[in-house]
């Protein structure tokens, strides 16, 4: 299942200066997905879902949270379209939008986002609806990258063995 090699990711740099003014470092933009998606509203899906995920997991900076309080409230209630927050923010993500932990996640996961998005919603990933049920499917993938793979649960055999041993001791 080959993915387009045309997709490129903006690297995250520290803020730089131009003529003495600080420039915000762009992390990703809707333009990164526009060619593959074919339409602006569809190109917003991967990063819109990603930004909603970051909001749900408190990976956004205090400044971002303060500036987008109204849209974040709708995200927490899962109201409206998932990409509304991303659209309201100008369809561009900046390094300053994230907490330090958020930036670590962004640096580690954003290069993988397109592949996970395409694999989760194949064959026509950009034809999905902008809704919370689709968001949840991708969020289930993203959480593994944020928290790591789930650890295997302790087998009930170990617990059962402990119970049998204790019951046997009581009968003696």
How would you label these PLM feature ranges?
Residues 155-172:
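Glycine-rich, aromatic-bearing surface loops/beta-hairpins
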Residues 28-30, 35-37, 54, 134-150:
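Polar/charged low-complexity regulatory segments
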Residues 59-63, 95, 99, 152:
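Intrinsically disordered or highly flexible coil/loop and linker segments, enriched in small
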Residues 2-14, 18-80:
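N-terminal low-complexity, intrinsically disordered segments
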Residues 76-146:
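Amphipathic protein-protein interaction modules
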